Structures are given as structure tokens and as C-alpha cells.
Amino acid sequence: MTEKLSDETRGPLLEPLFATGWELETGRDAIRKTYEFADFVEAFAFMTKAAIWAEKWNHHPEWSNIYNKVTVVLTTHDVGGVSSLDAKLARKMDGLTS
């Protein structure tokens, strides 16, 4: 079972993500990042690739797309906050853009 990150595990899992542009979501235990692409097609392609991984891992993002931008919010609703699944999906999403 996935658990909410403890104070001891948050730093090692989240600090590398903060270095790549992820940030804490204001007012809740979640992380957020906005990706910017050349155009809508690239943005939608990213969402399609990310959706395949999200479905495979049964961990689905809150996200929105406006033209060439995709804003992603990750939190694990079952545990009421950020878990290792969020860090895993964030790393995968970052990898899909490189």
C-alpha cells in the first residue's frame, strides 16, 4: 500500500523534482509543474505518452492543457497527500520531455 511521504522521505524524493521546476501546490499537499511545448500537437503528444504510464501505474494526474502548455498537479488522493507514486510519475513526465 502506498503511504503519504513522511518528513524523512519527502526531501530525498522531492528535492530533485524541485530542481526541475516542480513546486509545492499552494494550500494542499500536492506538487505542480507547467510544461511548455512548441505547439498544441507536442503538448497533446506529451499528455498521450504520460497517460499511458499513468494508466499502467493506476495513478492519474490532475492536469489541464491550454494550447502549448500542460499544467500537472500530482497528489495521491487515497493517502491525502504526496506519495512515492507522485514522485515516480513526476520523474517519468520529466523524462518524456527530454
UniProtKB/Swiss-Prot annotation:
Name the Enzyme Commission number(s) assigned to this protein: 4.2.1.96
Mind listing the GO biological process terms from this record? tetrahydrobiopterin biosynthetic process
Molecular function per GO:
4-alpha-hydroxytetrahydrobiopterin dehydratase activity
Q: Which InterPro entries match?
A: PCD_sf (IPR036428), Pterin_deHydtase (IPR001533)
| Gene3D superfamilies to which the protein is assigned, alphabetical | Transcriptional coactivator/pterin dehydratase
Which residues belong to the signal peptide in this entry?
A: none
What catalytic activity is recorded?
Answer: (4aS,6R)-4a-hydroxy-L-erythro-5,6,7,8-tetrahydrobiopterin = (6R)-L-erythro-6,7-dihydrobiopterin + H2O
* Keyword terms: Lyase
The family database entries (HAMAP family) matched by this protein are listed as: Pterin_4_alpha
Its family remark reads: Belongs to the pterin-4-alpha-carbinolamine dehydratase family.
Q: What is this protein called?
A: Putative pterin-4-alpha-carbinolamine dehydratase
Taxonomic lineage of the native organism: Bacteria, Pseudomonadati, Pseudomonadota, Alphaproteobacteria, Rhodobacterales
